[in-house]
Amino acid sequence: MRKIIHIDMDAFYASVEQHDHPELRGLPIAVGGAESRGVVCAASYEARRFGVRSAMPGAKARKLCPQLIFVPVNFDRYREVSRAIHAIFHDYTDIIEPISLDEAFLDVTENKVGEPMAVEIAREIRRRIREELGLTASAGVSYNKFLAKIASDARKPDGLCTIHPSQALDFIAELPVEAFWGVGRATAERMHLLGIRTGADLRERSLEQLTRHFGKAGRVFYDFARGVDERPVIYEWVRKSLGCERTFGENSAEPLVVEAHLREVVEELDGRLQRRQFSGRTLTLRVKFADFSVLSRSASFSEAFSSPELLLQRGLELLRGLDYADRPIRLLGLSLSHPPEELRPGMWVQQWLPFAEDEE
């Protein structure tokens, strides 16, 4: 049986700022969003108590929390700390799947320290992050990625939770459907209309019922409700492309808000590219709208690139080529593919992918 750990840093950007600036500790702070039409990148737990959230317009955040302190974004610093965190991970395993600068899965089934108990590795990683970096992390331990993620969410912030195989079905049964991967606001509403509100309700539905109502995602929900998730922890270095996505807190068709989200995606993607030392010639933008339709646009270039400046410039060009004024966006994704050795000469001409429908 596999042993999977999910590590999720607590309010990462805001916590780094509070660590580096002791005068901010214990105060409600927002990273980014100070400009008149800016958007909050991250909020400290003190600010979250007032309802301040990431991707929220700064003006709204200030109304919710008049004493909110805005600090500028410092992605170079966040990447530096993220690299230090990953260096700690690598002391225990090289089977690491980064999700973002502040989140990762680790497969410690076979590990470098010969520790049979995954929970002890998770406990040691959390201790080292606290002592060496002055930050806190939440960790979930289980036998697959779905349950490890659920476990880390259950004890945030600064917690450790283990879900053993014998506990999995009871744990899942009590989960609200909103806690399941792939269940956003609209899907949750559809589930509620069908009388599905918890993992137990979901488990009562047949595979045929779930796929009829939710398409391909129905199979995933069926498996998750039974504690089944066979997805491996994916090494970054075996991938032919690297990308990341961000789901909005609120759907938006406001260009400033959408482009602020794209900048955040670029920053996360840049961190992954740097760790992998990966470059590519094809950039793909993926947009999911409020009605769950999906549109992809791709452009290929003669030279491989990976700089955040070019990622942002070319990503914005793809985004600004779309007409979404009447189509609020709920998710943006950006990926870089075709490393230098994989794209044949002469394939540099810009290419556009057609509109495509997709399941949530």
What feature does the model see in each segment?
Residues 6, 179, 187-331, 338-359:
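DNA-contacting surface of Y-family translesion DNA polymerases
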